[in-house]
């Protein structure tokens, strides 16, 4: 096993010969995340709330930062559908994320995949 120093200064152990496939998988994941930057997305949370905002960044713990975020509450018997609450910059802890939907490139109305 060899120690590998990553860009952020962290080191990790790697086995001989496995570095090439790990690097390719890491590059693919990185490119996928980069393609999502500045795209609108909807995040469903464990407590039933939904946040819609612009994807700005994430980290190793899967926390997500949304810009210009709006919060939507799940309608219930005691709370009817209300106007969204404007949050601005919001950090969503990764362990509270149920699903993420990315807005399709559309000129008309926002559609999520």
Swiss-Prot record:
Q: Where is this region: Disordered?
A: 1-29
Which is an annotated Pfam family here? LSM
The protein's gene is named naa38
Q: What does this protein do?
A: Auxillary component of the N-terminal acetyltransferase C (NatC) complex which catalyzes acetylation of N-terminal methionine residues. N-terminal acetylation protects proteins from ubiquitination and degradation by the N-end rule pathway.
SUPFAM superfamilies attached here? Answer: Sm-like ribonucleoproteins
* Subunit comment: Component of the N-terminal acetyltransferase C (NatC) complex.
Could you confirm whether the keyword Oxidoreductase appears in this record? no
Q: Which keywords appear in this protein's UniProt record, sorted alphabetically?
A: Cytoplasm, Nucleus
The protein depicted here goes by the name N-alpha-acetyltransferase 38, NatC auxiliary subunit
In terms of superkingdom, the source organism counts as Eukaryota
Q: What is its main location?
A: cytoplasm
Record organism: Xenopus tropicalis
Q: Which InterPro entries match?
A: LSM_dom_sf, LSMD1_Sm, Sm, Sm_dom_euk/arc, snRNP_SmB/NAA38-like
């Amino acid at each position: 096993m060899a120690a590998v120093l990553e860009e952020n200064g962290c080191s990790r152990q790697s086995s001989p010969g496995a570095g090439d496939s790990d690097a390719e998988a890491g590059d693919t994941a990185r490119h996928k995340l980069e393609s999502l930057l500045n795209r609108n997305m909807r995040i469903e949370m464990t407590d039933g709330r939904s946040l819609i905002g612009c994807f700005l960044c994430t980290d190793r713990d899967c926390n997500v930062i949304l810009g210009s975020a709006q919060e939507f509450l799940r309608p219930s018997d005691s709370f009817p559908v209300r106007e969204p609450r404007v949050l601005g910059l919001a950090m969503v802890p990764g362990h509270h994320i149920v699903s993420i939907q990315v807005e399709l490139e559309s000129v008309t109305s926002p559609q999520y995949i």
